[in-house]
A protein has these predicted regions:
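Hydrophobic alpha-helical segments
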Residues: 1-192
Length: 192
C-alpha cells in the first residue's frame, strides 16, 4: 500500500443511496460493500459510469478469456504497485483458472520461465502499455493468435486497470478485512 490510511475515506454503507447500491449487481450484493466501491461512491456520477465500463471489462462481452483477462489485470496491478488491486484479483484469478504458481510468477513478468508463448505475449504487451502506452510491432505480431477484438479488449483491460490502480493508490483505498497485502507490493513504496 502506498499510504497507511485512506486519503478519501470510504462512505459508510448506510450512507450510500439505493440507486448506487443497485449498480453493484448480484455478484457483490451478497457481501459487505468493498472499500473501492464505498470510496468511489463519494463521486456518484463518476461511480455510475465507472461501474458501467468496469462491468464491460469484467463481463463476457470482453472477448479475452477470464484467465487471460486476470493475467493482464494482475500484471497491470503489480506494475502500478496497487496492493488493493492485486489482493482483490488474486482470488478472482484463481477462480478464473490461474494457478498459485502462475500468480506468483506474474510478478516476474514475461521474462519468467514457464510461460507459454501466448501468456508471454500478453504479459509483454501489458508491460509495454504500462511503461509506454503503446504495444511494439513485434509484440503486436506475437499476439497474432488473438482476434482484432481480443487485442482491442487487451488494451482496454490494461487501460481500465491502470486507471483503477491510480485511483486506488492515490485515494489510499485500504484493503478490505478479508484481504492480505502481498509483501512484494511494499517494496519501493513510500508509506506516508
Amino acid at each position: 500500500m502506498r499510504v497507511k490510511q485512506a486519503r478519501v475515506p470510504p462512505l459508510p454503507e448506510a450512507d450510500i443511496s439505493p440507486e448506487l447500491l443497485a449498480l453493484l449487481g448480484p455478484r457483490f450484493k451478497a457481501m459487505p460493500m468493498l472499500n473501492i466501491f464505498r470510496t468511489l461512491a463519494r463521486a456518484p456520477k463518476a461511480f455510475k459510469r465507472f461501474m458501467a465500463w468496469g462491468g464491460y471489462v469484467l463481463s463476457d462481452a470482453n472477448s479475452l478469456s477470464a484467465r487471460d483477462r486476470e493475467l493482464v489485470i494482475l500484471r497491470t496491478g503489480f506494475n502500478w504497485r496497487s496492493g488493493y488491486e492485486w489482493a482483490q484479483h488474486v482470488r478472482i484469478g484463481l477462480d478464473s483458472g490461474l494457478t498459485e504458481a502462475e500468480i506468483s510468477r506474474i510478478k516476474e513478468g514475461p521474462v519468467a520461465s514457464g510461460w507459454t508463448d501466448h501468456d508471454r505475449a500478453l504479459l509483454q504487451a501489458t508491460d509495454e502499455l504500462t511503461q509506454d502506452a503503446f504495444i511494439a510491432d513485434t509484440t503486436w505480431q506475437a499476439l497474432s493468435d488473438l482476434s482484432e477484438k481480443q487485442r482491442m479488449d487487451l488494451v482496454m483491460t490494461v487501460s481500465q486497470y491502470t486507471q483503477v490502480s491510480m485511483m486506488l493508490n492515490t485515494f489510499g483505498v485500504q484493503l478490505d478485512e478479508d484481504l492480505v497485502l502481498d509483501p512484494d507490493l511494499c517494496k519501493g513504496a513510500a508509506a506516508l
